[in-house]
Amino acid sequence: STKDEVIVGGSPTFALWAELSEWNLSPGTVTLWDQGYSNLFPDLNFEIAAHLLTRVISKPNKNLLCLDLGHKSVAAENPLEKRVYFPEIETYKIISQSEEHLVIECPESDKFEIGQHLIGYPQHICPTVALHSKANLIINNNITSKSWEVTSRNRV
């Protein structure tokens, strides 16, 4: 006789279903935990595992930084203030985003140089990861030459 396979659980219910070893889990976000679930489920105690590397490409005005993090790089389905979080910037407001650029208002903009790299945590990793063909791996806080192919990018 064939035993039926039960596939359960998304990321929010991962902790509940993880204890039921006879069932297969199907969470996606636990692999690349994002800012959104970090805010919604702090009790799950996962670290944010999806980081976006961006850089300051210009300073178009006083207190403004223009980053190369447009909606070709980070999912744009959320309101501006809920698309990406910058842990290295104490106070900022996202004021616009286009295909290629994201502009933030930042009172501490003098601290940042053109060309400087910044890390952004995506609010929602699922549509963000599909924008990229691979994910580079950071292991023990070191950037490596290893990467994962993002198969959702080119599926038929």
Please report, for each region that a protein language model flagged, where it lies by residue.
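Active-site anion/phosphate-binding pocket segments in diverse small-molecule metabolic enzymes
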Residues: S1-V156
